[in-house]
C-alpha cells in the first residue's frame, strides 16, 4: 500500500500481483476524524469483503480499479462518488434486473416517482434514469449510477466506465459497506446482461422499438418547443417552419389571417404571402412590419438550407420601400419564377475594424485613405461623374451598411479580403483587376495552384524589379520566385507585378516593412523583415509631413524598397491603377505565419482617386540630383563612348517596348513622344549597381543625373551583382572592380573635399565666380564634355555652380559667354561644388560621411595623392597633407581643440561650422606674427568682416598672416604676408 499526495488531495493505491485493485481519492472528511483512521477503516471493510473472490471467480475481467470520493453533506450526511472501470450497463436492462430481484442482491429499490414523465418534445412516454434506494438496516440511502467516459487528467478518453454517486449516507462505515454492495450488484448484473438482452429482443422489439434504448451513454435532455399561439396574430415562424430564419432576416415580420388584425396605422404597408400555395398554405395571409426603423415588408430569396425548395422566397422587413425591387416584382407574377432567374440578394458582409478580412468579404479601409478622399474634395459634385465604374453598384455594400454618422467617407472606399498565404499579393491584384473590369471581385475563383502558376510567370520579367532587388544576386532572385511557399514581398516585387498585369500599383502599409534579408538554408528561404522601430519612426515622420495628428491609424502611402542614398524612378506609365494594403491585422487576427498579409482597396469613384494619388506619389519620389552624389556606380571599360542617347529617347524606347508586348500606356496618344523617330525597340540593357538602366543596346544614356527604369530585357552586366553587394556606398578607389567615368569621379572628389572640410552649406550665401567657372570648364575637358554631350545646358550648369574665391567675389548671370571659358588662372587655392539647395548639401555631407567611414587606409592614401582631393576629416582625427601645396593646413575638429591647442603662426586653423554655437555668429582667428599672439573676432555679416579686414590690412602696428573662414557661408578671405 502506498500513500501519495497530489496537490490538496491524497489517495491510496492497493496492488495485488502488480495489478491495481482499489484506488481511493479522499477529498474531504468528517469533523474530528483522522486521515489514517479513515484509510484503515476503508481498507479493513474492503479487504474483508468477498470482492476479491468475485474478481478471481465469476467475472474477473469486468472490474479493475475503483475510485471513491468522499464529501461532506448538509445535515450531518456524507456523500461519495466512485467509478467502476470496464463495466457499463443499459438503463432499461438495469431497471429490469433490479425490479425482478435476486437472492444474492442487497435490498435495492427504484424510486419510481421520477422515472415516468410526459415530455412535449417526444409526445410519448419514456423511461428516464432512475434514482436507486439502498435499504441498510432500516436506513434508506439514495444513489445513482450512470455510464461516463473516463478522464485522463484533462483529456477525455474513449473508454467507458460506470459512475456511482452515493447521496446521503450517515457515516464512513455506511459508505464503505454500500459501495461494496453496489460493486457486487454490478458484477451480478453484468453476468445477466446477455440473458436480459435476449428477452427484450424476443418480446419487446418489432419494426420500431417500443422502448427507447440509449446504450452506454447519458440521455440528452431536449429543450421544450416554443408555445404555439392560438390567436390570429402570429409570429411568422409559427406558420413558416424555416430553421435559422432570423440569420438571413434580422427583422422578422408579423403574419395575420385578416387585414383587420393589422394595426390601423400599418395597413398601408402590407403584402400577401404566400401567393403560390407554398408550404401547403392555400389562403394567402397578410404580412406587416412593426419596426419603426424597418417598416416596409418585402420579399427575399431563401438561401437557407433545408427549406429553400418548400419556400423559395421569404418575407422580411426593410428600411426602404421594396415595391420596385426585382425580387418583389418577380414574386408578384401569376406564376412563381425560378430563383435562378432573379438577381440574387446582396449579402452585406462588412467588417468595421482593421482585422484581417475573410476571403470574399469587405471591410473598412485604412483611416488615412478616408482622410485622403476627404482632402481631395471627393464629395464635390464635379467628381461624381457617370463615366466612372458604375457597375460597382451591383455588389458594392449599401451606404446604410457602411457609413457611420461621423465619417461618410467610409462609404466611398472599402477593403476587400483575400485568402491568407504567401501569394496574397497576387490574389489581391487579380481581384482588383476583376473589379476594374466592372465585375464582382468575389466571384473570381482562385486556388493555390493558380497563384503558384502566376508567381512562376514573374520570373520572365524579374529584371524590371532591379531597383528593388539591387542587393540580391541575379540567381537568388529567381530562387525566391521559384519557392512558392516563400512570402512574396510587395515592397520587392511590385514592379514585376506591374509589368505582368499591366497596371500601376500603389502600396499602403501599416506597421509593415520590406524583407531586408533572404537567408538561404538548403531548399528553404528564411526572411528577415525591417525593424518595427524603424518602420514606426518613418511612418511617424510621414504623418508629420502630412500634418496628421491621428495616432490610431499608422497606415501610410509608401515607396517600394530601394537604396536610400539614390533616387528612385517610378513613372507609373500603365493606363490602369490599383491600390493594395499590406498589414498584419489586429492582435486577434494576426497572421500566424509571421509575414504580412495583402488586401486590395476599392473606390466608389476609382479614376478620380488614383489621379490625385499619383500627384501625391510623385512628390514622395527622391529628386534626381542625388544620382550625382549617391555613389551610383556602373561598369564602364571605356569612358569615351561616343554613341549616346538622351533620356527622352530612352523613355520612348521603353514605351515602344511596352506597347509591342500589348501593354496599355496612359501616355500613348496624349503626346508624340512615343512616335519619336530616334526611338527603337531595344534588346539588351546595362544597369548600374542600384538597378537603374544606363544603357540600351550599344547606346549609353548621356546624362549623369537622369536614368530610366529597368526594362524586362536581359542584363549585359548581370555579374556585377555578385561583387561586394553589401558595401554599396563604399569608395572603391583607383583599383576598384567597378570603374567610374572621369566626370563622375571628379564631382565625387570635389563633393568629398568640400563637405568634409567646411561642414554644412547654406546655399543662399554662395556666389558664382566667373573666372573660377572658366577654369573649371577647361579642367581636363570634363565639364566641356558634359556640355557638348547635351547632358545639361550652360545656363543650368552655372545655376548649380558654387565657387570659393580668394579676395573678391562676383556674381555672374547664367548667360555666360564662351570667351570667358578661355581665361586660365592659377586655381591652386580654389574649391568648388555643385549644389541646387541646402537640402542637397545636407545629403552630400551625409553621403560623404558614410563614404569616409567605409574607406580603408589604402584608399585614404590614394585619395591624398589625387590632384582633385584636398585634406579630409576622418573620425575627428587631425592630419595634414605632406605632398600638396597646402602642407601648412591643420583641421580643428572641435571648439575644445581650438581653444586648448598651442597656436603656431605657421598654420592656418579651420573651424567646422557645426561647432559654432550660434549660426548667426562666426569666429575668425587672427594671428599676430610680430607679437606672437592670437585674437578671436566675432563676425556677424559680410560688411562687418570687410571693415575688420580693412582695419587690420591698413594697420602698420599689426601684421597678420591669414584670416580664416567666415562660417556664415559668405566666402573665404585670405591675406598672405
Swiss-Prot record:
Coiled coil: none annotated. InterPro entries: DUF5757. Keywords: Virion. Its main location: virion. It is found in: Virion. Pfam families: DUF5757 (PF19061). Signal peptide: none annotated. GO terms for cellular component: virion component. It comes from the Viruses. Residues 531-556 are annotated as: Disordered. Belongs to the ascovirus HvAV ORF146 family. This is Structural protein ORF43. It comes from Trichoplusia ni ascovirus 2c. The lineage of its organism: Viruses, Varidnaviria, Bamfordvirae, Nucleocytoviricota, Megaviricetes.
